[in-house]
Swiss-Prot record:
It comes from Prochlorococcus marinus (strain SARG / CCMP1375 / SS120). The cyanobacterial PSI reaction center is composed of one copy each of PsaA,B,C,D,E,F,I,J,K,L,M and X, and forms trimeric complexes. Its main location: membrane. InterPro entries: 4Fe4S_Fe-S-bd, 4Fe4S_Fe_S_CS, PSI_iron-sulfur_center, PSI_PsaC. Keywords: 4Fe-4S, Electron transport, Iron, Iron-sulfur, Membrane, Metal-binding, Oxidoreductase, Photosynthesis, Photosystem I, Repeat, Thylakoid, Transport. GO terms for cellular component: photosystem I; plasma membrane-derived thylakoid membrane. HAMAP family: PSI_PsaC. Binds 2 [4Fe-4S] clusters. Cluster 2 is most probably the spectroscopically characterized electron acceptor FA and cluster 1 is most probably FB. This is Photosystem I iron-sulfur center.
Length: 81
């Protein structure tokens, strides 16, 4: 089942999500939009198993990283039958 990982612009660049991911799905990339000068990126979503450890590790009030499991992705896009 395919999962998607969305990084929101509320990311503070703390690297907690990157360190929490057991499969190295996430990485940090340069970004001028926050004090840390970096933001999480999800270049390897095909490896995501949906454990949501990245979500749990995120210290922001609004989860800056969200994992949408395959069926959640379909529902959120209005494609559920």
């Amino acid at each position: 089942m395919s999962h998607s990982v969305k990084i929101y612009d509320t990311c503070i660049g703390c690297t907690q999500c990157v360190r929490a991911c057991p499969l190295d799905v996430l990485e940090m990339v340069p970004w001028d939009g926050c004090k840390a000068g970096q933001i999480a990126s999800s270049p390897r979503t095909e490896d995501c198993v949906g454990c949501k450890r990245c979500e749990t590790a995120c210290p922001t009030d609004f989860l800056s990283v969200r994992v949408y499991l395959g069926d959640e992705t379909t529902r959120s896009m209005g494609l559920a039958y």
